[in-house]
């Protein structure tokens, strides 16, 4: 619903604001920024609804008690179980759910490892890479395919890495004996609807007010980096021509003039193709493109080129943005999805200047491992800032997760290339 509403508002802006920086700022910057905040709201509200129900009926305390022995061995608390499980859907409500953990050390460790759980935003990256580059070999008598094994492995990566990270955090930054797990087990009772909804409202409002402004600002900054300083004159002219052609097509359809409709559709297709090509060129000429070229020497050992680097930088507001960015760079437009065969085809056909393919299974796995471990989610970092009341911990989270992601992607690519040769 929020996605549809975002598209409706963007279309209204496109219909009423002429092509230019203002339209792009409103449609691609402001609307995307507001959508980037609201898109998390249903997940957060739903999570807090269930947490409030479990708390009010008395089950949450028992779940924490049951899981405490296992979680303590990992350097966490039994109360860390629900926040970490929630992080598989989205790390934002997972981080916010750590409020139920009274012990500061346990809460901080849980906050810092929660983003390692593979959230739903990583799934489009996994789907695109496995669909395009992982062969559909079957195992166990045809019950399991190689893409399914790879996809499942990406979820395991975060869990496996989170265990030593949590242990190291407890041995370094958050030293101290784990206090005995003592708590009063309340009696079971039916939850109060009024109390549950009041908690959901208060916590959801806190997210929108506190983290929303920072998420919005980050989205605007990334938009500006992808828009300036390139000259968009030709792009704006093409957008105007496409809109005029669409009006002409609508008029011809009313007149039932099919031959001219077909001719106009062909002309529109050529204009769209040219617009997508220009959009890709403008990305390269933007500050974002220049950053991609600047980091290319650093990402080349991962098997990446500057285009993949741009996609990674552009995905900082949200990981799934890399799909639209790659679609724009490869002249397919920003509306392509992870299951679009044209994007997979373009990536498969992409080559380096010497003619060697850019993408293969080693590069695809390198990208997936990077996204499984990286902190490419501004919203999560902003929530960590709000929950810890310090910039130190989101910066620390970004640095340690990016380092882990880089090392993991490097090992994956280098080992993969050895196996391929």
Residue ranges and their predicted role:
Residues 1-30, 34, 74, 95-110, ...:
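Extended, low-charge hydrophobic alpha-helical regions
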Residues 4, 8, 12, 61-89, ...:
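Juxtamembrane inter-helical linkers in multi-pass membrane proteins
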Residues 4, 8, 12-13, 17, ...:
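Core transmembrane alpha-helical segments of multi-pass membrane transporters/permeases
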Residues 47, 114, 141-157, 161, ...:
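Alpha-helical transmembrane segments of multi-pass inner-membrane proteins
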Residues 47-52, 130-133, 154-168, 217-227, ...:
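Hydrophobic core segments of alpha-helical transmembrane domains in multi-pass membrane transport
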């Amino acid at each position: 619903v929020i996605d549809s509403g975002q598209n409706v508002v963007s279309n209204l802006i496109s219909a009423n604001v002429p092509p230019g920086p203002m339209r792009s700022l409103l449609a691609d910057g402001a609307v995307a920024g507001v959508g980037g905040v609201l898109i998390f709201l249903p997940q957060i509200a739903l999570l807090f609804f269930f947490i409030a129900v479990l708390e009010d009926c008395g089950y949450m305390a028992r779940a924490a008690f049951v899981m405490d022995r296992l979680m303590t061995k990992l350097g966490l608390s039994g109360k860390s179980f629900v926040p970490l499980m929630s992080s598989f859907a989205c790390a934002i409500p997972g981080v916010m759910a750590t409020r139920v953990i009274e012990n500061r050390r346990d809460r901080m460790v849980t906050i810092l490892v929660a983003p390692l759980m593979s959230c739903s935003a990583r799934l489009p990256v996994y789907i695109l890479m496995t669909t395009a580059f992982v062969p559909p070999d079957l195992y166990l008598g045809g019950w399991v395919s190689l893409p399914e094994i790879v996809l499942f492995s990406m979820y395991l990566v975060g869990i496996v890495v989170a265990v030593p990270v949590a242990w190291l955090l407890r041995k370094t930054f958050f030293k101290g004996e784990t206090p005995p797990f003592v708590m009063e087990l309340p009696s079971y009772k039916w939850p109060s609807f009024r109390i549950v909804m009041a908690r959901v409202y208060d916590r959801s409002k806190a997210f929108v007010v506190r983290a929303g402004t920072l998420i919005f600002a980050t989205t605007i900054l990334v938009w500006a980096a992808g828009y300036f300083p390139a000259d968009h004159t030709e792009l704006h002219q093409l957008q105007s021509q496409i809109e005029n052609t669409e009006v002409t097509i609508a008029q011809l359809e009313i007149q039932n003039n099919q031959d001219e409709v077909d001719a106009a559709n062909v002309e529109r297709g050529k204009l769209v193709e040219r617009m997508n090509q220009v959009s890709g060129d403008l990305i390269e000429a933007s500050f974002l493109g220049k950053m991609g070229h600047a980091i290319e020497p650093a990402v080349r050992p991962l098997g990446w080129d500057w285009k993949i680097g741009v996609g990674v930088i552009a995905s900082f507001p949200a990981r799934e943005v890399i799909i639209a960015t790659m679609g724009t760079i490869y002249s397919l437009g920003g509306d392509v999805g992870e299951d679009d065969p044209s994007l997979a085809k373009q990536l498969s056909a992409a080559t380096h200047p010497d003619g060697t393919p850019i993408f293969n299974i080693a590069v695809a796995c390198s990208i997936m491992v990077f996204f499984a471990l990286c902190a490419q989610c501004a919203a999560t970092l902003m929530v960590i800032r709000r929950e810890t009341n310090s910039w130190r911990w989101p910066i620390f989270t970004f640095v340690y997760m990016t380092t882990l992601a880089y090392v993991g992607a490097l090992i994956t690519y280098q080992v993969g290339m050895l196996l391929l040769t």
